[in-house]
């Protein structure tokens, strides 16, 4: 997984697979992007189709030349055949909730970094077991959906520190909390390798997208 070595990375989860959103994020200073297939995204309200339906838009986003990861689905919608096809497109990593990942997920990723998202109740022991099974990065899902948009808490920082200190792979924190730029230093100090800005903080409007991302990139 391609991340800056000396600082926290700012990644952006696109609320739609649109090149205009990707371009705005890159201009605002994003180090990488995340796109989706086969899932309904809670925070943005977007339903993403299968790889064939999203392929043209994904190619346009990948053509920007910044590292991009692909969410390959949710419970019951992850297609190993689609993952095999997507490996050839140039994605930096694949991502799925660990609880939704097929047993052959790591092998299906091939040369693409296999990332999995921990559930809100998963801690260091679960993280260690996933790394032992070949996962190359972890997304620390921090909140149940009914708490999305709440401020960063001490409990989340403590959980992040516990997980990050237990594994030797990057730990990425998504903005399920309503993170503010000043939170990035706290996340870095607790062991995060990257923050993943999503719809909770970026919104979904193309016109405002870059302006909402820029303060986080400037805070590094």
Predicted ranges, named:
Residues 65, 77-166:
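Conserved anion-binding
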């Amino acid at each position: 997984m391609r991340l800056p070595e000396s600082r926290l990375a700012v990644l952006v989860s696109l609320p739609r697979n649109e090149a205009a959103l990707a371009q705005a994020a890159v201009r605002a200073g994003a180090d990488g992007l995340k796109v989706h297939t086969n899932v309904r995204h809670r925070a943005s309200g977007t339903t993403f189709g299968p790889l064939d339906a999203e392929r043209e838009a994904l190619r346009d986003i990948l053509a920007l030349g910044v590292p991009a990861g692909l969410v390959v689905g949710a419970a019951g919608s992850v297609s190993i055949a689609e993952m095999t096809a997507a490996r050839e497109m140039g994605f930096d990593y694949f991502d799925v909730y660990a609880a939704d990942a097929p047993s052959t997920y790591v092998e299906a990723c091939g040369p693409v970094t296999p990332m999995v998202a921990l559930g809100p109740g998963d801690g260091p022991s679960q993280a260690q077991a996933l790394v032992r099974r070949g996962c190359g990065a972890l997304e620390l899902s921090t909140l149940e959906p009914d708490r999305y948009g709440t401020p960063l808490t001490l409990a989340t920082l403590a959980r992040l520190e516990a997980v990050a200190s237990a594994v030797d792979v990057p730990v990425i924190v998504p903005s399920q909390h309503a993170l503010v730029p000043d939170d990035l230093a706290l996340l870095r100090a607790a062991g995060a390798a990257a923050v993943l800005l999503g719809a909770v903080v970026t919104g979904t409007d193309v016109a405002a997208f870059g302006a909402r991302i820029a303060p986080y990139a400037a805070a590094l």
